[in-house]
Design a protein with these regions (language model features):
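Conserved short beta-strand element of beta-propeller blades
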Residues: 1, 19-46, 51-53, 64-88, ...
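A short, compositionally biased
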Residues: 4-6, 48, 112-118, 176-178, ...
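Beta-propeller domains
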Residues: 6, 10-15, 46-57, 61
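Short loop/turn segments that connect beta-strands within beta-propeller blades
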Residues: 14, 56-59, 185-189, 313-317, ...
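Autoprocessing Asn-cyclization modules and mimics
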Residues: 21, 67-69, 84-157, 196-199, ...
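Short, surface-exposed beta-strand-loop junctions and turns on beta-sheet-rich folds
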Residues: 60, 153-154, 282-285, 417, ...
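Short beta-strand segments
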Residues: 62, 130-132, 192, 263-265, ...
Length: 448
């Protein structure tokens, strides 16, 4: 009997492709940190003195100036990308223009790169609140940035701005000392030493630096938006909102338009319709629109085979030890993870319901150390919980790597070539595309 084969080949079959190799071999502690900007570049720090940037569109690496890290490079070293440019803060002004026109900003910075395609946020002064594309810039002291679209009012010496360009925070390992914690600014091609005071005396087991930025994949990620119905010197109110009490603590609110546009504040408390913040420079009113997002001012560090969790305040350049209401059940060990989950798809209503949103509220962390344990930190509630998921028979240890994309965490199990995908909305682990060529050995180092 004649038959017809109606089967069709699978479209978009998962497959692995080789990319350009790092110019030099990796070593224990080598880590990769991805920017969250439109070019999605990756910084690789190979040692205290070697670093490279990878351009995925060109599949190539370029060395950059030495990180100049102190300490003994190895396990525990970590890096993460933040959204703010040199000298910028969340609650105060620091980058002030020296003049300009309706299409140009004369900066107070020495820019070292072509920043076309990136954005600039106007914090105060003429055109406050505007988020503009950079069309071109000069490479010199007091660099001139040309922006689009043209604005109604010329920029001036009262313009306060932020370049929304990559900024990588890098933490070394071994015995910590001055220059163990540094930041690389992409726009100026400079490294700056930051304070390590408040961290442990030494770091020697896997660790993670975690950012909660307002900008994701080249644009602002807002968890709630609206227009104020009233405000005071320390509050913003929108009557009719039905937020859960305290759900926005440690998030940030940005005034996107109207009175007070450009201001950003950390939320210290909230009721069903009221946000409490530090004192506004200009009190918002009924013309003020706002957006709530992740907090650019905080970094978190977990790891070092300890349950202790640290938070870095970028504005103050200080570290503090957090005291969660419920401590983490087990210390993170070799092969641990740490990711802020912010973009579970909109189809998951419980993750995106503004009145009790889950997106942006939690940091998830696999314990590592030969276990399958998964823990979750509540940023607003300052508490840890252990997450039940299935199947949970696979364990993770030295060399396991993780990469977050939207609502899924992709997991490379050490060097053996097996991959898994963890779905946060479903609390479920799935098998994923097997690598055809396992690595020769497990790599100790961070990925972000």
């Amino acid at each position: 009997m004649a038959t017809t084969n109606g089967n069709k080949k699978i479209l978009d079959l998962k497959r692995w492709e080789f990319c350009a190799i790092l110019p030099t071999t990796t070593q224990a502690g080598t880590f990769v940190a991805s920017s969250r900007h439109f070019r999605q570049q990756q910084l690789c720090v190979r040692s205290n003195s070697e670093a490279f940037i990878y351009n995925p569109s060109e599949d190539g690496w370029v060395p950059i100036t030495s990180p100049g890290l102190a300490g003994t490079f190895g396990a525990g070293a970590a890096g993460v990308s933040g959204a703010w440019s040199t000298g910028s803060t969340v609650g105060a002004a620091s980058l002030t223009a020296t003049g300009g026109s309706t299409t140009t900003i004369i900066t107070n910075q020495t820019l070292a790169r072509d920043l076309r395609g990136y954005k600039v946020l106007i914090m105060a002064g003429p055109n406050a609140g505007a988020v503009l594309d950079i069309a071109s810039n000069t490479i010199a002291a007091n660099a001139v940035i040309t922006v689009t679209p043209a604005q109604a009012v010329a920029f001036s010496a009262s313009t306060v701005y932020r370049l929304l360009t990559p900024r990588w925070y890098v933490l070394g390992a071994g015995t910590l000392a001055a220059a163990s914690f540094r930041v690389y600014d992409y726009a100026t091609n400079t490294w700056t030493t930051l304070s390590q005071t408040g961290l442990p005396a030494s770091l020697g087991t896997d660790g993670k630096l975690i950012a909660t930025p307002s900008m994701i994949d080249g644009d602002f990620k807002s968890f709630a938006t609206g227009t104020a119905t009233s405000a005071t010197g320390t509050t913003l109110v929108q009557t009719g909102k039905t937020w859960a009490t305290s759900q926005w603590i440690n998030s940030q609110v940005r005034i996107t338009g109207g009175t007070g546009a450009g201001q950003i504040r950390t939320i210290t408390a909230n009721t069903a319709d009221t946000l409490t913040v530090a004192t506004w420079t200009t009190t918002p009113d009924v013309t003020s629109t706002y957006a709530i997002s992740g907090n650019d001012n905080f970094l978190y560090y977990i790891g070092n085979n300890a349950v202790t969790m640290y938070r870095y305040d970028i504005t103050a350049n200080t570290w503090s030890t957090l005291s969660p209401i419920a401590a983490r059940a087990n210390a993170p060990q070799a092969g641990m993870s740490g990711h802020w989950v912010h973009s579970v798809p909109v189809s998951e209503s419980d993750w995106n319901n503004e009145s009790a949103i889950l997106n942006g509220r939690y940091i998830y962390s696999f314990q590592g150390g030969g276990s399958a344990n998964l823990h979750r930190y509540d940023i607003a509630g300052n508490t840890w919980a252990t997450i039940t998921y299935a199947p949970n028979a696979e364990v993770f240890s030295t060399g396991t790597k993780y990469a977050l994309h939207k609502g899924t965490l992709y997991i490379q199990k050490d060097q053996i070539g097996r991959w898994y995908a963890y779905d946060f909305a479903r609390s479920e682990m799935f098998p994923w595309g097997m690598m055809l060529y396992p690595q020769g050995s497990a790599i100790v180092g961070d990925t972000a």
